[in-house]
Amino acid sequence: MGRAREMGWMAAGLMIGAGACYCMYKLTMGRDEGNELENEEEDEWDDEQDLDEEEADIWFDFTAMARPWSEDGEWDEPGAPGGTEDRRSGGGKANRAHPTKQRPFPYEHKNIWGVQSFQTFPCALNLTKCAFSQGKKMFTESTIAGFSLTHNVSRHLSSLSVVGSRSPTPQPTVREKALDVPEHPNSSIENQDQIKMYIDEVCRDAVFCCCKSFLQQAGLGLLISMTVINNMLAKSLSDPKFPLLSEGSGCAKVQGLEAQMSLPEKPVLAEEVLAAQMLFSFMCLFTRSGSREMLVEAISP
């Protein structure tokens, strides 16, 4: 009986010892496995960081590319060049900012044709000696810059440079095209000041090219358009250098008279024109033989 009890206690002790040893073994092995898992996770993290650094050099946010530029030409939304954008990284990790590089052409340019580049267009006209080619280019140049600029602004940029560079040219067709390009040169005082620099050439074209009625019409059209906000035409008609009605051709006389008769609709210009020049113009037409028909044609509605 006593012997059996001793054997029972010995078996229980062995089982308890074996269990304790097994627990110590599991704790030791589990700690090693945990360290290995942590090392593997750290290696994976380092690999992902290396991949993210390489990816940042070539990664583009295509949705941000489709967004419009702001008014000042800056990218002020996520995905801007030189900026950052948050996006989910792989493996459910925390959000990290990924820098993006400057977008290549054409995204880095808002306007293909700018004011600076368009001002080089008259250089091409100077290299072309053919009168027909020059006139053709002048006629079409105002619509070329419309790709990036408004139509009116582009016409001003082209017409002002053309009036200055082409008026002294000997070809009447080229001068006619140069004077005929401006549609609304009165949009700014700067534009008018630039045209005033070449107003003498315009007046000479309208007066002394007696056999070139179309050139005279173009010159008169430019002068009349300048009277919208100032009295340039009134001063030009009163100037001795602009004796259109006394020395111009028949067509030019009629047009000059019509221009003077339309000026009284602008009260600011009426007094200066009607004071002397208008009366002198009527007297010239009445006293010369063959001029009364021109007067009737000019005053008829």
UniProtKB/Swiss-Prot annotation:
Pfam families: Arm_2. Residues 26-301 are cytoplasmic. It is found in: Mitochondrion; Mitochondrion outer membrane. The gene is Armcx6. The keyword Transmembrane helix applies. May regulate the dynamics and distribution of mitochondria in neural cells. Belongs to the eutherian X-chromosome-specific Armcx family. Keywords: Membrane, Mitochondrion, Mitochondrion outer membrane, Signal-anchor, Transmembrane, Transmembrane helix. GO terms for cellular component: mitochondrial outer membrane; mitochondrion. It comes from Rattus norvegicus. This is Protein ARMCX6. Residues 1-7 are mitochondrial intermembrane. The keyword NAD does not apply. It comes from the Eukaryota. Signal peptide: none annotated. It is a single-pass membrane protein. The chain crosses the membrane at residues 8-25. Residues 1-6, 26-36 are annotated as: Mitochondrion outer membrane (MOM)-targeting sequence. Residues 70-105 are annotated as: Disordered. InterPro entries: ARM-rpt_dom, Armcx_regulator.
